[in-house]
Each structure stands twice: as C-alpha cells, then as structure tokens.
C-alpha cells in the first residue's frame, strides 16, 4: 500500500518538554522506531508538524533588528530541513542501507485572498503565561490566543490548494524511497498577480489539511493521522466518553470536535476517505502497525455499515 503518515506536533516535541536538539532527536528516534517496520511492505510518505520549532525560531529572530528578522516562510523551510534531517537519519539507523530516504522542501499554493489572513487561528511556538504573552504582544506586535491554561502566538492558516513538488514526490516513490515532505503544512506560496512568479507569505498551513491534500494528489491507499490520542472520542474527558473504532465520513461530520486539535484531523481524514472510497486512520503513533491493519485507533471509510465502537 501507499501510506501517508502525518505525525502530530507531539512527535518531536511534547507539551512541556524543553525545546532542545537532544529532546527532539530522542522523539524523532521514537517516531522512527514506530514507522520503520512498515517500510518492507509499504510505500511510505511522512509529514510532520513544526509549530513549536518555527515559533522558537521566530522568537530567536525577534532579538535582531526588524530588517534582519527572517519571515515565517523562511523559518518554515528551516524547520522542514531540521526535522526532516532528524527523522531521515533515525530511520536510516534502523533500516537497511539500501533503503533510500529523502527529505524534500515543499512549497504549497495558497490564495492571497483566503479569509484565514483576516482571522489568525494557527498556534505556533511555545506556551506562555498571560503576563509573558502580554509583554511579547506589546514588544513584537504578535497576536496571542489562549491554548488551555496558557497562551500561544497565532498566525494566519490559509487552505492549501496545490503542492508544487508533487511530481518529485511521485518520482521518489517510484524508486521505493521513503519521502519526508510537507513539514508543518508546507511553505505557503502564491503566484504574484499578473506574473508567473512565486511569492511566499507569512502564514502557516494546517499540517493535517496539507497531509490530506498530499495523500489525495499521491493517490494514497491510506492516510494515517498519528497523534497523542489513541482514538477519536465523543464527549472527550467526560464520564460519557466513547471511543470510535469504525466510522463513515458522514457519521463523523454530525459531531463537533475541538478546532485546535482533533477537528482538523477528522476533517482531513473524512475528506480523504470520501475521495475514491479510501481509508483514513486516526490514532496513536505507538499503535501505527495496528492502524495499518485496521485494528487500532479510529478507521474511517465510506464502506462501513455503521458506526462502531471500541
């Protein structure tokens, strides 16, 4: 099977962990250990989040003069290289030398008139208490929103329209290469109006929506949204909580899921499952082999007879 694996933001940096290279390296190793056993039987494409990493780079860059600070699109490209390098090396340490791996910088087309630019919603960077967030807001002009009990920076999150590097990804897959691409949702890019020239924008594309687009453009058989939750649940955190095992896209669209966490994953999974009656899975990275077999997590396919529970 051709499988696209979207690693959640916790894959390289869990909430509360220090944003050090050693921490991210350790978590990359854990992700590689989960994914490597699939390589013998499947074509693998890996995407990943980059919110904490790109936010940290932006904060570091804010120490420079305004004209010296790098924009978010450049920072996103930096994180694609950094995270891809760690994942690629850790996978290479587990797989035979003959198994090719490649990390690909990925530009993704967006619409400059996307309404997302008028209402920033995408969390990036570390968490702050309110006093610290207020101080940075005053100094840097950043927009902050509450994330649980803490505060995080938010930026625009336009909808991805097209992946510019989709042909190189296909070429690499034809050679049985494990491809790491579209990190952090890819680099937001648009054509300059009236000209055949690409421009990049200060924004962050939702990694789940981009992963779904990538899976559709690659005609993948399975899209896996690997997260820190074992399943999609109804009434999360309540006594009435129920874990969904199997569902059709229409079963899930009748429910409401948190916009900042499970919501985009469910939306992307349902959109993919509707395209050609394909299968999507949402679950824990540790259960990834069970997700491929359809035994663990939440499996989404239009052919199921009814909603099923764990």
From Swiss-Prot:
Compartments it resides in: Cytoplasm
Enzyme Commission code(s) on record: 2.7.2.2
Catalytically driven reaction(s): hydrogencarbonate + NH4(+) + ATP = carbamoyl phosphate + ADP + H2O + H(+)
Listed pathway(s): Amino-acid degradation; L-arginine degradation via ADI pathway
Listed GO biological process terms: arginine deiminase pathway
InterPro entries registered for this protein in UniProt: AceGlu_kinase-like_sf (IPR036393), Asp/Glu/Uridylate_kinase (IPR001048), Carb_kinase (IPR003964)
Keywords from the named record: Arginine metabolism, ATP-binding, Cytoplasm, Kinase, Nucleotide-binding, Transferase
GO molecular function terms listed in the Swiss-Prot or TrEMBL record: ATP binding; carbamate kinase activity
GO cellular component, one term: cytosol
Family to which the UniProt record says this protein belongs: Belongs to the carbamate kinase family.
Protein name per its UniProtKB record: Carbamate kinase
